[in-house]
Every structure is written in structure tokens, then in C-alpha cells.
A protein has these predicted regions:
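Extended, non-catalytic substrate-recognition/exosite surfaces adjacent to catalytic cores, especially
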Residues: 1-180
Length: 180
């Protein structure tokens, strides 16, 4: 017998993933995962790079003033235009981002990047988040655990931040602050 509610568990997983993705997007694009991949290795690198949370690997094949061409795992060439990237923020440090200006400052031929497709198959730049999160939802009447999420993606990090992590000093009073 468990107090876990499967609907709440699914919602908690989705909430952690969307929250981490939104946070990571607000803090800016950090750049390519890998650089200077030789052209004759592109197909092999793409085949050996896992898709993570719908974030597909792609390799920059050409750079122009107004667009870049990327090669996807399926072997197709896609176009990312300057207009597609106009809202992209660039990571500077933990508290600073800068506005994206030129494609040549951000991408080089042979860069391994990530893309994500929306419902209309339009692509945009993505990245695997650099942060993790955890969530525990409890019933306040009897303390039963309703949902438990130990991280962003178990395949990338099997460390369960709910059951294995230690609380930070000073965190004991936060529930009382949030309850008021």
C-alpha cells in the first residue's frame, strides 16, 4: 500500500521538468555541447548522442549572416534563422545574460548543439539544463507522501535529491515562511 497518487506523481514530474527548463532558459544559452567535430565524424557523433527530454542533437554545418544550417540525427539539414533566435539570451554568469546579436559569435562549424521541435515541427535552440530540482508533495492532514520527484532526469543523474540529499543549513524554517 502506498499514499502516492499516480496523477499527482505525473503532474509533479511534469512540473519539475517544466520548471527546470524555464529556469534554464531564463539564465541563458551556454553554448555548444562539443566543438570542432570533424565533418567525417558528424553522422557517428549524432548517432551516439542520446536525445534527452526531446532535445535532439544537431551539428552546425554552415553559418551565414542570417541563418545557420544544422544536420540532424535523421540526416536531414534544417535551417535556424536569425529571426528564430531573436529572443535567445546568452549566459554570461549565474546572474547575468546578454542579448544575442550575431550568429558568427555564437556558433562555429562542427558545433554539437541541441534543438527542440514544437507542435508545428518548428525548431529552436535547446540545451540540457545545468541544474537539478526535487519535489515532495505531502498530505498535511496525515503526512502521507502524494508525489516524490528526485531530479530532472534519472537517466542523466540517478542521485535522488529527495531521499539522498542533505538539507541546506537554514532550510528548516522555510515551510513556516511559505505557510504564512
Amino acid at each position: 500500500i502506498t499514499t502516492i497518487d499516480s496523477r499527482m506523481q505525473s503532474a509533479a514530474i511534469e512540473s519539475v521538468k517544466s520548471g527546470v527548463n524555464e529556469y534554464d532558459l531564463r539564465h541563458g544559452y551556454r553554448g555548444a555541447e562539443s566543438f570542432d567535430i570533424p565533418e567525417n565524424d558528424w553522422i557517428e557523433v549524432l548517432a551516439n548522442t542520446e536525445v534527452s527530454e526531446n532535445k535532439e542533437p544537431a551539428i552546425v554545418t554552415d553559418i551565414f549572416e542570417d541563418r545557420i544550417l544544422i544536420l540532424t540525427e535523421s540526416g536531414s539539414t534544417e535551417i535556424l534563422s536569425l529571426n528564430d533566435l531573436k529572443n535567445l539570451k546568452i549566459y554570461v554568469d549565474a546572474s547575468t545574460t546578454t542579448k544575442f546579436t550575431e550568429l558568427t559569435n555564437l556558433f562555429d562549424r562542427g558545433d554539437l548543439i541541441r534543438i527542440v521541435r514544437d507542435d508545428t515541427n518548428k525548431i529552436s535552440i535547446a540545451q540540457i539544463p545545468n541544474i537539478q530540482a526535487a519535489l515532495i508533495a505531502m498530505n498535511p492532514q496525515h503526512g502521507g507522501i502524494k508525489a516524490l520527484v528526485g531530479g530532472y532526469n534519472f537517466k542523466e543523474s540517478s542521485f535522488n535529491r529527495v531521499t539522498q540529499a542533505s538539507r541546506q543549513p537554514g532550510s528548516n524554517f522555510k515551510p513556516f515562511i511559505y505557510a504564512t
